[in-house]
C-alpha cells in the first residue's frame, strides 16, 4: 500500500508546524529593604504565588527550570588577573538589588518572555532582567569546537 494513501485512508493530516521556541533567562533581583518593609507574612504569600505560578508554567512547557539563590552574603566572587586568582566575599556590585534567583523560560520571542516574567511577584519588589539564551551549538560550530 502506498504510504500517502495509507495516511489518507486513516484521515491523517500533517501537523501544523510550530513556531520555533527560544530560551530566555529571567534573572530575579530583589531589594531586601523593600521586602522587609512589607507586612508580616506578605513575602511568604508572594513565594507561594510564585511557586504555584512556576508549577503552572512548567506544566505548560514554558518554564524549563528555576532556582532561588542563597543570601548574597554567602557568595564568593572569583577573578583571575595576570595569572593570580582573587576570591572575595559577596557580590561585586554595590547595589540595593541583589540576584536572588533565576527562571529559564521557553517562549516564542522576547515579548512573550517578558510577559511571563512580569507575572512573577518579584518585579514589584525588585527587578527581573530577561535575556535571550545564546545557542551554544551555533557557537560551537562558529568557533570549530
Spell out what each predicted region is.
Residues 2-7, 11-145:
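Conserved, structured core segments of small domains
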Amino acid at each position: 500500500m502506498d504510504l500517502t494513501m495509507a495516511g489518507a485512508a486513516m484521515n491523517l493530516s500533517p501537523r501544523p508546524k510550530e513556531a520555533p521556541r527560544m530560551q530566555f533567562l529571567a534573572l530575579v533581583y530583589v531589594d531586601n529593604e523593600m521586602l522587609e518593609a512589607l507586612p508580616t507574612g506578605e513575602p511568604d504569600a508572594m513565594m507561594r504565588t510564585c511557586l504555584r505560578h512556576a508549577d503552572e508554567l512548567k506544566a505548560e512547557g514554558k518554564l524549563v527550570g528555576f532556582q532561588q539563590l542563597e543570601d548574597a552574603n554567602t557568595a564568593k566572587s572569583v577573578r583571575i588577573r595576570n595569572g593570580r586568582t582573587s576570591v572575595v566575599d559577596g557580590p561585586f556590585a554595590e547595589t540595593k538589588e541583589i540576584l536572588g534567583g533565576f527562571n529559564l523560560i521557553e517562549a516564542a520571542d522576547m515579548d512573550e518572555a517578558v510577559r511571563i516574567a512580569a507575572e512573577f511577584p518579584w518585579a514589584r519588589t525588585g527587578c527581573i532582567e530577561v535575556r535571550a539564551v545564546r545557542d551554544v551549538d551555533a557557537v560551537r560550530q562558529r568557533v570549530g569546537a
